[in-house]
């Protein structure tokens, strides 16, 4: 196996534990890897403004694949080195339909996230950890009319997220209706980032495509890459990477796609994987 030169790490459920924190063991091991010349990037469904920039840069992480692969940014400068955005008219057409449902939704534009005032009451209905709730409330820029805002800015939309209230027994409010809307548009692809949501990007855009761009940009061959993840939006990234690592807490789909299953996100599984595949430990 080729020497690993680039590692892409999912954040929620992978790098972050259930308390939304990076363990000291993970921090130390990532920093050790970057000091040894390995490039480490986060690969997330989050926008740039939702990233803990100082924390990530402090352990040597300098790139962020955001919006499920729709944009790649340098940290801490927020320089966008790659973007593959949704068509504005298409997004507006979909949002006009989604707005008729009892859901929460927002859009990602140039590393920031915007939501309409009308969905404020739905934030607390979303089934997600307290830390993520707080992040959503603090990071979103509120506008009166989101469709009108998107049209007037004239800037491409990196990703759109739609969250559902969880009713129990696997049922989410208006998810089936939303799915029926999204299924009418072959120009997009959607998946879940966890927390009972759909996230859609332009068709063909994934964390895997973002990883391929970043590897090419920094001169790393794909057979020198490793990726760690836990949920559906990590699937294509694991498929593209030479070494695909599933967290111990990962979904069955991700575990089946992986070359190796590490410890859980509450057990510093990222550190264990880096120690194994970069430093040759745990043989």
Explain the meaning of each model-derived region.
Residues 2-6, 23, 183, 198-283:
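Mg2+-dependent phosphoryl-transfer enzymes with acidic/Ser/Thr/Gly-rich catalytic loops
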Residues 10, 44, 230:
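Active-site glycine-centered loops adjacent to acidic/histidine catalytic or metal-binding residues
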Residues 97, 101, 108-228:
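Conserved acidic, metal-coordinating active-site core of Asp-based
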Residues 2-4, 37, 61, 102, ...:
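A general structural motif
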Residues 24-129:
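Active-site phosphate-binding/coordination module
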Residues 22-37, 83-90, 143-147, 202-216, ...:
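Short, acidic loop-to-helix structural element flanking the phosphoryl-transfer center
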Residues 59-60, 68, 76, 184-186, ...:
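Short, structured coil segments at secondary-structure junctions
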Residues 3-20, 94, 238:
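Asp-based phosphoryl-transfer active-site loop
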């Amino acid at each position: 196996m080729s020497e690993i030169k680039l590692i892409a790490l999912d954040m929620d459920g992978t790098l972050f534990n259930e308390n939304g924190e990076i363990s000291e063991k993970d921090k130390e091991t990532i920093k050790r890897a970057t000091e040894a010349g390995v490039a480490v990037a986060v690969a997330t469904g989050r926008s740039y403004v939702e990233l803990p920039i100082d924390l990530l840069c402090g352990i040597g992480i300098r790139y962020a694949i955001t919006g499920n692969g729709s944009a790649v940014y340098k940290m801490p400068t927020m320089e966008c080195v790659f973007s593959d955005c949704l068509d504005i008219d298409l997004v507006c057409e979909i949002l006009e339909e989604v707005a008729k449902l009892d859901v929460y939704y927002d859009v990602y534009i140039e590393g920031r996230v915007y939501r309409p005032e009308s969905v404020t009451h739905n934030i607390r209905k979303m089934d997600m950890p307290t830390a993520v709730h707080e992040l959503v409330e603090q990071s979103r820029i509120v506008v009166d009319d989101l469709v009108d805002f998107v049209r007037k800015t004239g800037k491409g939309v990196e990703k759109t997220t739609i969250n559902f209230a969880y009713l129990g027994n696997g049922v989410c409010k208006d998810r089936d209706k939303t799915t029926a809307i999204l299924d009418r548009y072959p120009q997009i692809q959607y998946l879940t980032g966890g927390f009972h949501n759909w996230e859609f990007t332009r068709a063909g855009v994934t964390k895997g495509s973002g990883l391929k761009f970043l590897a090419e940009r920094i001169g790393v061959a794909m057979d020198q890459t490793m990726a760690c993840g836990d949920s559906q939006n990590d699937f294509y990234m694991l498929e593209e990477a030479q070494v695909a690592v599933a967290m111990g807490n990962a979904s069955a789909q991700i575990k089946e796609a992986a070359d190796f299953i590490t410890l859980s996100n509450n057990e510093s599984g990222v550190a264990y994987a880096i120690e194994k595949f970069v430093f040759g430990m745990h043989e």
